[in-house]
Amino acid sequence: MAAGDFRLCDVVLDDTIGRSTPDVEHERAVAIFDLIEENSFAPIGHAGGPYRLNISLADSKLVFAITTEDGGNVATHILSLTPFRRIVKDYFMICESYYEAIRSATPSRIEAIDMGRRGIHNEGSQTLKDRLTGKIEIDFDTARRLFTLVCVLYWRG
């Protein structure tokens, strides 16, 4: 473990919830790949990683279980899903519209839906970043990728 190495080296989603649609699973795979490639993840009060993150749902709560690369316990943070419910619901609705649009809509229609989708995704990302304040310091791009994974878990659950 290198002191000050504040990044994720592995991210795992709760597999007990099951799989989702191919589109959602693709989003999950891309988000995890991008997250591992580039992220900023600093649990408050810890000397440094890299870290492994297990994201799960338990009793309608979002659970972030963090360990070091070699498995040493760092922290577990449990967040209420309530602040995310409306955002995730809106995000799923617009994603369904987006996936339908890419099959048959005009490029301008697809672009308009995609702009709305990105806006809602940004709102969810900022909400997640805010909810982790004082627990884990992350940058906005890391928050975006983590929010995608929260949505995947929510969709499965």
UniProtKB/Swiss-Prot annotation:
UniProt cross-references to InterPro entries, sorted A to Z: UCP032146 (IPR008321)
Q: Which Pfam families match?
A: UPF0262 (PF06793)
Q: Which domain of life is it from?
A: Bacteria
Sequence similarity: Belongs to the UPF0262 family.
Q: What is this protein called?
A: UPF0262 protein RHECIAT_CH0000657
Q: Which organism is it from?
A: Rhizobium etli (strain CIAT 652)
Upper taxonomic classification of the species?
Answer: Bacteria, Pseudomonadati, Pseudomonadota, Alphaproteobacteria, Hyphomicrobiales
